[in-house]
């Protein structure tokens, strides 16, 4: 059995393309994506990978706690939070490889993941979710908080996608790593589309260890 595989399926589950490898996978798909198409990344649970499932997305260092992560190609409103060139055209290069030990041990942005979606829950990390996302729009989804885009001088469509709380005083964002991690720095980049953004007054950060211990 190979260590990594990437496959593309249509809305009915028909296999459109696939490739696998022990260390690295490069999958070329020479067709336009259609609504309902999905990409599935398969790896041994516990693997650290560097993935780039579209050549527009920035490569992401991820931890696979589960074996299969399936993301649906965004169309319509779901596409507005992405660079318009993402998943476009009639030829695509999807890449994944095992991370080197030095990459695993190096100091890095532990939160960054340009490939995060709701379906990553319990499978592919880092993963983020929230208890409130304004009107359920992709441009205000929690995943935008960790997609690596730091442009914050407006809001709505890319490049101004963000996490929006709809003025909820009890809004919470949860960032999961899928494992215990060490950190020495926390950086928050608030949206600064004034006077639209004048709601935040303070924030409370709670760290939760694997054993459930909390530190505020």
Walk through the language-model features, giving the residues of each.
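Core residues of folded domains in eukaryotic genome-function proteins
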Residues: 171-173, 179-184, 201
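Beta-strand cores of modular interaction/reader domains in eukaryotic scaffold and signaling proteins
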Residues: 176, 187, 204-206
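Disordered, acidic Ser/Thr/Pro-rich linker "stalks" and the adjacent N-terminal cap
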Residues: 1-48, 53-176, 197
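A short beta-strand element within beta-rich, extracytoplasmic domains
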Residues: 181-195
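Trp- and acidic/polar-enriched beta-sheet ligand-binding modules for extracellular glycan
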Residues: 155, 167-170, 193-216
